[in-house]
């Protein structure tokens, strides 16, 4: 009888732990969100004027509204993560966890056009080589927010 009670108690504890942990299992981490929204290592540069229209849609950045501005970085994830140990600068919001790349990086800026209207979001594609500024958090310290390019 005691063994049966112990087994039932163990199962109850396991179920309660699963219920508590389960909601976070499907949640995208800030680092994964940064990668989805800003990383495009497979492309060395914007390949066409339609690049932003395609990428913004495929990365779910036009799901509920037209995101006004977004930047894609065409460098390796390791190179972008390395920025978190480079030049410390103030973020636009005043936080102190932003870092500027020592070297320029290949980026594509996507800006919503005046004729854009949800759900038919339209973007202007601009290719550039600039220093990037990212906010970093966590352990390991990784990019979680694209702050600017200069």
Swiss-Prot record:
Pancreas. Transmembrane segments: none annotated. Keywords: Disulfide bond, Endonuclease, Glycation, Glycoprotein, Hydrolase, Lyase, Nuclease, Secreted, Signal. Its EC number is 4.6.1.18. It is an enzyme of class 4 (lyase). Pfam families: RnaseA (PF00074). GO terms for cellular component: extracellular region. Interacts with and forms tight 1:1 complexes with RNH1. Dimerization of two such complexes may occur. Interaction with RNH1 inhibits this protein. Monomer. This is Ribonuclease pancreatic.
